Swiss-Prot record:
Gene3D superfamilies with a match to the protein in the record: Phosphoenolpyruvate-binding domains
Name by which UniProt lists this protein: 3-methyl-2-oxobutanoate hydroxymethyltransferase
PANTHER family membership: 3-METHYL-2-OXOBUTANOATE HYDROXYMETHYLTRANSFERASE
Database matches in Pfam families: Pantoate_transf
Location relative to the cell: Cytoplasm
Subunit structure: Homodecamer; pentamer of dimers.
Keywords: Cytoplasm, Magnesium, Metal-binding, Pantothenate biosynthesis, Transferase
Protein residues bound to 3-methyl-2-oxobutanoate: 51-52, 90, 120
């Protein structure tokens, strides 16, 4: 039986209303209790338990490989670590595309088993009916358009979106808004297109490599703190945590081998 989430968590969906904050919205991905506990004190507007966990946590080759239970286990830990944060959970590939009924069942299962605030799913006009069905069931939905990692094979690889398909992406943004989403992620979309969409739709736009003019910004925390193998162009590294961890481990190993650990104050009385 899963542990019930904290009843003290506050819903902050109003933060996503255009102009309600008077500033940019700021969010990061998060995948575990300990990191969530730290991020809960960083004045972020939201945390996303993204399907990017497929690679950075589970080591799969693409985001489409992660399954629902794997995401739910992570999300439940994040909610326990940051019970007062607005936490969004990605619906994994294959858990919502088939039908409105499946999409609603998956979204409700995620919310019930994790205590999260909302779900996110990929796709614009082609997934508008799924968004609408989930919203009607009472679950807030964040959309995701532009580059959609779950369908990378159909997109032909990692490519900037909007250079030759701007009209389609614009229509996707409108469809997501009309379906009832409270916000939409625009990933790897040209800055000009992201600016146009942001100025013309009424829901908040969250940029991931989409330039300066979106209503908010989102990054994968592993990229931000230097815990990723690959360096992402649109994600500057503010630290090199991989080097810090390696240095700590090597120093401790050295102390063990040289008889300097444990010291007296490391031994329980």
């Amino acid at each position: 039986m899963s542990r019930k989430p904290s009843p003290t968590r506050r819903t902050r969906i109003h933060r996503f209303h255009k102009g309600s904050c008077g500033r940019k919205l700021v969010g990061l991905t998060c995948y575990d209790f300990s990191t969530a506990r730290v991020l809960s004190d960083c004045e972020l507007d939201f945390l996303l338990v993204g399907d990017s966990a497929s690679g950075v946590i589970y080591g799969y080759e693409n985001t489409g490989s992660v399954c629902l239970d794997e995401i739910i286990y992570l999300a439940a830990g994040v909610v326990r670590g940051a019970p007062n944060s607005f936490i969004i959970v990605d619906l994994p590939f294959g858990t919502y595309e088939k039908s409105d009924e499946l999409a609603v069942e998956t979204a409700i299962e995620v919310i019930k088993r994790t205590g999260a605030s909302a779900v996110k799913l990929e796709g614009g006009a082609r997934m508008a009916c799924r968004i609408s069905a989930i919203v009607r069931a009472g679950v807030p939905v964040m959309g995701h358009i532009g580059f959609t990692p779950q369908t990378i094979n159909a997109l032909g690889g990692y490519k900037i979106q909007g250079r030759d398909n701007a009209d389609l992406i614009y229509l996707d943004a409108q469809a997501v808004e009309q379906a009832g989403a409270f916000a939409v992620v625009m990933e790897m979309v040209t800055e000009d297109l992201a600016k146009t969409i942001t100025s013309e739709i009424k829901i908040a736009t969250i940029g991931v490599g989409a330039g300066r003019y979106t209503d908010g910004q989102l990054l994968v925390i592993n990229d931000l703190i230097g815990l990723s193998e690959k360096k992402i162009t649109f994600a500057p590294r503010y630290a090199s945590i991989d080097n810090t961890v390696a240095s700590c481990v090597k120093l401790w190993r050295k102390d063990v081998l040289e008889g300097n650990f444990p010291q007296k104050d490391h031994i329980p009385a």
